[in-house]
UniProtKB/Swiss-Prot annotation:
It comes from Solanum lycopersicum. GO terms for biological process: protein localization; signal transduction. PANTHER family: 14-3-3 PROTEIN. Residues 245-260 have a biased composition (Basic and acidic residues). Homodimer. Pfam families: 14-3-3. Belongs to the 14-3-3 family. GO terms for cellular component: cytoplasm. Residues 238-260 are annotated as: Disordered. This is 14-3-3 protein 4.
């Protein structure tokens, strides 16, 4: 497999996606990414890489939330033996999460961000960098959490600077960045006002230019706008403290070319 061409690895990644073998999908797309030192990934390639990692990390994030919820219930009941067992099990999931995040962050730093030449590609990969530092911040504690949060903020701000200057307010990648950046403010930094302001500004700016939206990205853009509005409704409601699990974030790559 080491000598497989870039095209063959892309095709194998598509097969792995159809078979829902996402760990293997990552392996194939990492090979592609490591050959993209000079030439950046195509829209299709970066979306395949994103989908692969999103599925692998998503399953572990869901597992971590379930186990953490059980841990809280057992703590409230005073079941110390169970709590200790759960903590050990949770640490295994956290080790998995760390390994996955470290893998994509290393790839982004060494290959993907340096080779990105278009504004769209730069924002896509910087957003991705912010996303995976944010996933680390979700479960890390102490100085590690602080460092992960700082890295998230830096990546999202770098992406935002380019997006605001180079991408239209209706561009799905710009909207997806605003969505995930606002979730970061709300969930990680506990700044609901900043989260709401960022989400509202992105939504309002996109609404004002909706008539300029091309047919190819209309579906992607309006979907993310709906998610922004859903979060705003959630965050400004009286019972926002009780509905953390319902917060929406960009779960699919926003290609700008209608590829979900």
């Amino acid at each position: 497999m080491a000598d497989s061409s870039r095209e063959e690895n892309v095709y194998l990644a598509k097969l792995a996606e159809q078979a829902e073998r996402y760990e293997e999908m990552i392996e194939f797309m990492e090979k592609v990414a490591k050959t993209a030192d000079v030439e950046e990934l195509t829209v299709e390639e970066r979306n395949l890489l994103s989908v692969a990692y999103k599925n692998v990390i998503g399953a572990r994030r869901a597992s971590w939330r379930i186990i953490s919820s059980i841990e809280q219930k057992e703590e409230s009941r005073g079941n110390e033996d169970h709590v200790n067992t759960i903590k050990e099990y949770r640490s295994k999931i956290e080790a998995d999460l760390s390994k996955i995040c470290d893998g994509i962050l290393s790839l982004l730093e060494s290959n993907l961000i340096p080779s990105a030449s278009t504004a769209e590609s730069k924002v896509f990969h910087l957003k991705m960098k912010g996303d995976y530092h944010r996933y680390l911040a979700e479960f890390k504690t102490g100085t590690e959490r602080k460092e992960a949060a700082e890295n998230t903020l830096l990546a999202y701000k770098s992406a935002q600077d380019i997006a605001l200057a180079e991408l239209a307010p209706t561009h799905p990648i710009r909207l997806g960045l605003a969505l995930n950046f606002s979730v970061f403010y709300y969930e990680i930094l506990n700044s609901p006002d900043r989260a709401c302001n960022l989400a509202k500004q992105a939504f309002d700016e996109a609404i004002s230019e909706l008539d300029t939206l091309g047919e190819e990205s209309y579906k992607d853009s309006t979907l993310i706008m709906q998610l922004l509005r859903d979060n705003l409704t959630l965050w400004t409601s009286d019972n926002a403290d009780d509905v953390g699990d319902d917060i929406k974030e960009a779960s699919k790559p926003e290609s700008g070319e209608g590829q979900q």
